[in-house]
Amino acid sequence: MFLLYSALITLLSPIIMLGYLRRIRQGKETRALAGERFGTQLETPPSGRDVYWVHAVSVGETVAAKPIIRELRKARPDAWIVLSTTTLTGRDVASKVPGVDQVIQFPIDFPWCTSKALRTIHPKLIILMEAELWPGFIGTAKRMGTPVAVINGRFSDAKLTSWLRFRHLLSPAINGVDLWLMQS
């Protein structure tokens, strides 16, 4: 299923790129951060340090990630903590979160973007805040042997129905998660 998703997302990449360019024109993305979204202009964490990658989509998820990052920093004071966001407003908030060593834009879910980003960051663990599941990213992480945890996730009946409709395409993401810490 990972190959099917990768083929489909690659086939749709011209349309997705047009949407990305539109977001730049609307001010929802910035050209200066395009390299991060494509996984090419990322700082390599220092060697010899465990890397933990926390992904929070926007402001709400970033705020929810603060206690996780605080406890992670207490438990692993020498770790390198990367916090990624998808939105510019989330990035602004993320840049002020104590204990974070690196703030980046989350890579677009194209196979070449996610694999480049994951090879550069090389995390020991990926923590996804809420149920923000990207099949390409999670599938690539699994192929690299990186565990993935979803924290603070919620599934409404509507979301579950939607996911079930696309379960064949989403199975790499769902099956790739090692730990689910969900809200009821």
Go through each PLM region and give its residues:
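Membrane-interacting alpha-helical segments
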Residues: 1-19
